[in-house]
From Swiss-Prot:
Subunit structure: Part of the 50S ribosomal subunit. Contacts protein L20.
Family under the similarity heading: Belongs to the bacterial ribosomal protein bL21 family.
PANTHER family: 50S RIBOSOMAL PROTEIN L21 (PTHR21349), LARGE RIBOSOMAL SUBUNIT PROTEIN BL21M (PTHR21349:SF0)
GO molecular function, one term: rRNA binding
Taxonomy, superkingdom: Bacteria
Gene: rplU
Organism in which the protein naturally occurs: Methylobacterium nodulans (strain LMG 21967 / CNCM I-2342 / ORS 2060)
Protein name: Large ribosomal subunit protein bL21
Keyword field: Ribonucleoprotein, Ribosomal protein, RNA-binding, rRNA-binding
Organismal lineage: Bacteria, Pseudomonadati, Pseudomonadota, Alphaproteobacteria, Hyphomicrobiales
Gene Ontology biological process terms in this record: translation
Amino acid sequence: MFAVIKTGGKQYRVAANDVITIAKLEGEAGTAVTFGEVLLYADGEGATQVGAPTVSGISVAGEIVAQKRGPKIIAFKKRRRQNSRRKRGHRQDFTVVRVTGISAA
């Protein structure tokens, strides 16, 4: 059994006990989260439901494992012969989530 969910502008194929890294969600480690935007649902017996755009009555439950930050990305801009340069660093925040189950309501 698996589902395709949409969160943070991206789509993820998830099954029970999967650990996924997604865009930052608010909450501490151990907090329960629910994903309601399910785009596709397939049970183990070959039946598949494809949403237009979402499948109603299906939700994916998960638990926040950790809040982390990605590697530092350096943006460097230089104008030659002008003694002008700018350096900026950026670290993207993301959330690690463990999928606890897929439920049909």
